[in-house]
Amino acid sequence: MKLNRQKILDFFKKSQSKASVILSDKAKASNTIKDALGKAVTNKGDLEGVWSKLLLLFAVSKDYVNGDYTEIPKRSIIAILGGLVYFLSPIDVIPDFVPVLGFVDDIYILNLVYRQVVKDLEKYKVWKDAQIKFIGNIDGSTAS
């Protein structure tokens, strides 16, 4: 099956517009991330090829929405959230209920988003690793 990339990208642009609106409401943004994570966990086998990327997209979007990490351009967060909105939509270019092929377009979009924001994600990973180290040092020093 050949992907209609233009149709997928047009649908993704609509998802990004929705994401921009969702991002202005912290509760909606949090729920969108939570719902997308739930769908991802349920369909982990179909998403194996993008699983680690997807977890990183969830983490940075959650930390951004919670106000823990804001050193990422808003356009990057909108792209990430747009990818999650696209992923959440059961009726997109290839409906998710279509056996075997249902997630092909979702994986295409998630990979596209990842490539678009990879530099921002690398900075986020450095920050996140520092946070984990810092917390580990606090835990280690209080245990002594």
Per-region residue spans from a language model:
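Terminal, membrane-proximal amphipathic helices
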Residues: 1-77, 115-144
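Alpha-helical transmembrane segments that serve as single-pass membrane anchors or pore-forming helices
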Residues: 75-118, 124
